[in-house]
Amino acid sequence: MKGQQKTAETEEGTVQIQEGAVATGEDPTSVAIASIQSAATFPDPNVKYVFRTENGGQVMYRVIQVSEGQLDGQTEGSGAISGYPATQSMTQAVIQGAFTSDDAVDTEGAAAETHYTYFPSTAVGDGSGGTTSGSTTAVVTTQGSEALLGQATPPSTGQFFVMMSPQEVLQGGSQRSIAPRTHPYSPKSEAPRTTRDEKRRAQHNEVERRRRDKINNWIVQLSKIIPDCSMESTKSGQSKGGILSKACDYIQELRQSNHRLSEELQGLDQLQLDNDVLRQQVEDLKNKNLLLRAQLRHHGLEVVIKNDSN
């Protein structure tokens, strides 16, 4: 495995592995394994892989991806190494110290070389003090003698992943404790902002408060207009319902009084007409009386007017 990695990294700074090639020619089953279509395992066309059998016919596979930065002359050796059988579940555990300092000096860029190691929990879950297992994937970053816990970088960043058996990785490596992340994720603390619903609620409350104030003012004015309420309000607090009830009674009384006054006004109008007719009749009688007196004087008769009071 280590020799394959060196050969891939030292030949003119590029890694060239044909899709479906067999890593070990000794296994007769490798040819059948290499015929598996790439779309079934890795839908990304940029990922190349090689299948091989190991330890009793268990299928292991190696995936290599070269970024454009490495082809342009960037530092080689930066990559990710991960391994798990193709037939097992994806539940993985982290094994610390998978690469020792002796393994790291085999290449020219060993001082800055970074490895990300993945292992299935079923293969390394027994007797591992620094092993963690779960549905999520943990990553051990090994740089020289220090080990840091980080997250796996997606393949789009250009790193490559090498899958191998756990026995090849664990030989000669001592386990170390996993350190926490150097740069923990800290969500941005935003100042509390008033949401649209809160603004709408505050505006609605303000409108309701103004409406209640207006209603209270009108009720106070009614209590001042109604005679009974004005006296009771000075003695004890008058309820709004009592004020409105007395206001309704007072309005009913006013309506009845107005109706009665309208009827009396109609009677007065009729009396006025009768009075005018009587006055006209009195005037006519006076004129006739004067004519009769004039005729009596013409005939030599004197008219003596007797006073009833005498």
UniProtKB/Swiss-Prot annotation:
Biological processes annotated in GO: cellular response to glucose stimulus; cellular response to insulin stimulus; glucose mediated signaling pathway; glucose metabolic process; late viral transcription; lipid homeostasis; positive regulation of DNA-templated transcription; positive regulation of transcription by RNA polymerase II
GO CC annotations, alphabetized: chromatin; Golgi apparatus; nucleoplasm; transcription regulator complex
Subcellular location(s) per record: Nucleus
Composition-biased stretches (Polar residues): 1-17
Region feature (Leucine-zipper): 271-292
Crosslink position(s): Glycyl lysine isopeptide (Lys-Gly) (interchain with G-Cter in SUMO2): 306
Domain bHLH: 199-254
GO molecular function: bHLH transcription factor binding; DNA binding; DNA-binding transcription activator activity, RNA polymerase II-specific; DNA-binding transcription factor activity; histone deacetylase binding; protein heterodimerization activity; protein homodimerization activity; protein kinase binding
Keywords noted in UniProt: DNA-binding, Isopeptide bond, Nucleus, Transcription, Transcription regulation, Ubl conjugation
Main location: nucleus
Region described as Disordered: spans on this chain: 1-26, 171-209
Biased composition (Basic and acidic residues): 190-209
SUPFAM superfamilies on file: HLH, helix-loop-helix DNA-binding domain (SSF47459)
Record carries keyword Transcription regulation: yes
Complex formation: Efficient DNA binding requires dimerization with another bHLH protein. Binds DNA as a homodimer or a heterodimer (USF1/USF2).
Job description of the protein: Transcription factor that binds to a symmetrical DNA sequence (E-boxes) (5'-CACGTG-3') that is found in a variety of viral and cellular promoters.
Stated name of the protein: Upstream stimulatory factor 1
Record organism: Mus musculus
